[in-house]
Amino acid sequence: MASSAVQICSNALLLLGDKPINSFDEGYDRALLCSNLWDNARQAVLRAHPWNCAKARVSLAPETETPAFDWSYQFALPGNCLRVLFVGETGVPEDYTIEGRRILADVNPLYLSYIYDNEDVASWDALLIETMQRYMAFSMAYPLTKSATLRDSMYQEYANLLKSAKAVDGQEEPPETVGDSPFIDVRR
């Protein structure tokens, strides 16, 4: 199993029928292409699904400056936040909005669950690694081969693998339960 960005990119190159690389700094066009695409590709694939290996939780304190209207507090999103999953605690969602890199809400503190930019490939699930290899192959297919057909084929492989990986990754989560709510209590 690939345990580094370079190994993932090498495997993606092999999927395209190209030679592997040993480093992003090799001086070959394919190594430079891998290096240029890696960060954005990683972030796109991590954003595509709430991967268990890229989830984080944090309690945020409000900034000193308050929003001009509608909301009582504003909170800076963590620097490594790629996607907000949930705002609130104990299964009770809070109302909020996102503006730029800030969350506006009427609660203090703000409990945030999110996807972070997990750069530690060694901590990734095997299916996430396979999915990332297909995404890199898709991203590099046209620049390396000038073949739209190969690019489209690699995208289809990526999409199919992502679908399977989401199903497997999602099965590791316990089933969602209905949290405490005044609306639910009335029904009991």
Segments predicted by a language model, with ranges:
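Internal mixed-charge
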Residues: 2, 7-8, 90-188
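Short secondary-structure subsegments characteristic of cysteine-rich extracellular domains
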Residues: 26-45, 150-166
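Divalent metal-cofactor coordination and adjacent catalytic microenvironments
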Residues: 32-102, 124-140, 144
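N-terminal start-of-chain detector that recognizes signal peptides
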Residues: 24-26, 83-86, 109
